[in-house]
């Protein structure tokens, strides 16, 4: 997943107002020199400074309620939706659950969770995020609900029963 291509693909369907909102979420402010022409470049430039730009982008899309685009970020295709026997709205619900869990994990939690989950989900995605990894695997070999059950068990194992209840 390439940063520039991903951002341009995602923001292609955004209105100017949504672009400014996205820039504000990523950058924390909207520079005076910013205009509708260079806004994509500013978003890409800001995200390129982050080692986990995919997680940052994922959280912004979640805040903006661009759930269809979140699925896009997870590289969910129409074929993958058909293959998983789930409808788009059902997958969107699972994405919201996963992003919510991701937003509430500490760095320590994430490291411990990675260690446990790697046994079940070898990383077949370039993304560093546990959640991206889990979701991409959901659409491959494992049934989605099995995958969520496994995540729930792992969250309990690392002492995050509070988050396990939300899955």
From Swiss-Prot:
Residues 2-75, 93-167 form the DED domain. Keywords: Repeat. Gene3D superfamilies: Death Domain, Fas (1.10.533.10). GO terms for biological process: regulation of apoptotic process. The keyword Transmembrane does not apply. InterPro entries: DEATH-like_dom_sf, DED_dom. This is Uncharacterized gene 71 protein. It comes from Saimiriine herpesvirus 2 (strain 11) (SaHV-2).
């Amino acid at each position: 997943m390439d940063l520039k291509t991903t951002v341009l693909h995602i923001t292609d369907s955004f209105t100017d107002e949504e672009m400014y909102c996205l820039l504000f979420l990523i950058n924390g402010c909207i520079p005076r020199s910013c205009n509708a022409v260079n806004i994509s470049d500013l978003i890409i430039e800001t995200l390129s400074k982050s080692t986990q730009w995919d997680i940052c982008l994922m959280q912004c899309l979640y805040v903006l309620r661009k759930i269809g685009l979140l699925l896009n970020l997870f590289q969910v295709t129409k074929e993958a939706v058909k293959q998983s026997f789930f409808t788009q709205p059902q997958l969107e619900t699972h994405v919201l659950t996963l992003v919510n869990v991701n937003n509430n994990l500490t760095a320590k939690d994430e490291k411990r969770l990675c260690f446990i989950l790697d046994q079940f989900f070898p990383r077949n995605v370039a993304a560093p995020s546990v959640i991206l990894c889990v979701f991409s695997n959901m659409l491959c070999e494992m049934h989605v609900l099995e995958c969520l059950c496994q995540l729930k068990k792992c969250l309990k194992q690392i002492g995050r029963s509070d988050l396990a209840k939300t899955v």
